[in-house]
Amino acid sequence: AYYCFCEKAESEEDSGDFDRAEDPCRCLSQQEVAAQLAAGKPYVIRQKIPHTGTTTFSDASFGEITVENSTLDDQVLMKRDGLPTYNFANVIDDHLMGITHVVRGSEYLSSSPKYNLLYEAFGWEIPTYIHCSPVMRDAQHKMSKRHGDPSYEDLKAQGYLTEAILNYVALLGWSPRGELAEQEFFTLEELVQAFDITGISKSPAIFDLEKLNYFNSAYLKALSPEAFLAVAEPYLKQGITNPSIDLRLVAPLVQTRLNTLTEIPPMVDFFDRLPEYSNTLYLHKKMKTNEENSLEALQLVVPVFQAMTEWSFQAIHDALLHLAEAQGLKNGRIMWPVRVAVSGKATTPGGAVELCHILGKEETLRRVQQGIRQLTPQA
């Protein structure tokens, strides 16, 4: 190392970005250094990198890497304010903490030779380096919180399960080997057992939100009914404030239809309040329904519902199917108009029977009768 009294910007001090061949301080004698110090001239302390030869280091992911010493700069070790630079402090801190493996981004590969020269200068054992390629948001840009890319906390707030995030992120830039090579889903314990440094990729991985959605959807579907209700309940309550709606009945309807938990509120809000809707929802090519025959279907349904003494899923199912059969109609000719009338939506979690069962007899009849009024031509 040597004292450097040259006037340089602080950024130059930190980066070591200068032409050391022309730096007069590199070759100052002890007497010249003493004179400068006695004069109170500010200084930094730089690492004296050899001009010739090579420095070789081994990386567990990238293998053995050799660089020409002539390409390395004389990095600053101590700044003018007397504080160590990050690189210098990092080496000392890692040694004092007994760090055996240094895992960091591949952008730090170029710094490793200078780290090694410091370890060698101190006579310390060089740790194992594992440089990992960055996670990219696209082919050109790294993921960055500064540019709006999500953190773990952001993903949690967006309705992703911890287990799904962990599983997906573990497979970014790493892949299992051997008999596990084709396996996609891992518990944390399985990841611990399967992980091997040799599986780390040298190429950057691109963060694919659709793939994360795939993982999250699979994890949501795999939850037991009780476990799913526990994670979904806060979101169900955002969409449904009516205490008469049994969330335990709603939860199974949405569990298999989700990518994220935040999709739940707009999916179930019609249970709380019937939205305004267009009569065009009654038009369904496959079900062969239109406004006219939908009106007829709802008018047939009202007395059937009114006469029912048991309001269960099976009772509603049997009553509607019996009505369709008695009228010589396909089931869809009855089911679709009822579904639209009670939900006001083109797509719903669950069909007509499930929705009517959850809404209850009184609310179902109120909505069906409202549908009749809406479909009835005005004189």
Q: Each PLM stretch: what is its role?
A:
Residues 116, 152-153, 213-216, 233, ...:
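Amphipathic alpha-helical segments within well-ordered protein domains
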Residues 314-376:
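Charged substrate- and nucleic-acid-binding regions of tRNA-handling and nucleotidyl-transfer enzymes
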Residues 225-327:
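Small-residue-rich helix-loop
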Residues 168-169, 195, 216, 251-258, ...:
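Short alpha-helical scaffolding segments that buttress acidic/His motifs in well-ordered protein cores
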Residues 155-163, 202-208, 241-250, 325-333:
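Structural motif
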